[in-house]
Amino acid sequence: LLSSGRKFAGSDFGFRCRRRTVIAAVAALVLLPSEAGAAGWLSDIFKGPSKQGKSPAHVASRKPATSAKRAAAPKPHAVRLAALGPANLNFLKPAASMCDPSKFRIVLDVGHTAESEGATSARNVPEFTFNLRLAQRIEEKLKAEGFAETRLLLTEGKARPSLAKRVAAANHLGANLFLSIHHDSVPNSLLEDWEFEGKKGHFSDRFSGYSVFVSRNNPDFKTSLLFAELIGKAMKAQGLQYAQQYTQAIMGRYQHPLLNKETGVYGYDQLVVLRSTRMPAVLLEAGSIINRDEELKMDSPERRDITGNAVAAAAKEFCGPQEAFLGPL
């Protein structure tokens, strides 16, 4: 795909293609807010127990083997929407022709917001805290590998309006890759009750593992899939296993097709942040925080380092000779 883009770059055909791409991109940005607003059921991946949902089955309280106190969310240091600079249109160029790490911009989207925190872990820590810590570590790893243009993206407000803000910010920043950072939960029907440090909570030890999502409606799906597979490959190389529950009927409306059984890449075609960004986009669920054992791992600096190393390795391979691994796609 990227080789074909270079082949026609100097021709009249290439000019017409770029002109149509620019027009389509501008139209997409204008239509974005109404589109995102209409997608009300999309609050990213499902997150946490619903106040309206059925009460989970009760399980006798038990003391965890290892305790972990709720930690305050780290102080944000990120790109704010109000501070965005002039738009960069480099995202319209083929990725292979501009994959110089020092100039290649990866936007790390911190899933959820301080006002709408996403899932709640088994020990009652908000997902947003996990997302921010991990995104900050990934940013450090990427910059250490020479990806100096990496940007951390924080949005504010409620979940649904923030979807449009994320897409608009990524498009405005001229990102070459968009990676949204999340931590996983399960549907309400799979949750059980327990107590931790005298407080009621919910857990499900049934599933664990990371998962990677892409949208086949993204304007550059093939490159999205490529980067997602590289992340999955790198996570697997670190000894991690992907979550396999998304293909099961028990997941209900959260069921998704598995696109690569080797790397744990799933399709999530209608997710706004994956389909409406104008650059390749991937969502990483780093692990399950509703699983009591995995939550402890996700809360450790060691696990954040492992995940950060995997993402950095994927980015380095992505910026290597593209023709070497585009074939299987």
Task: Label the model's feature ranges.
Residues D12-V26, L32-L329:
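Catalytic-site microenvironment of enzymes
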Residues L1-C17:
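N-terminal secretory signal peptides that target proteins for export/translocation
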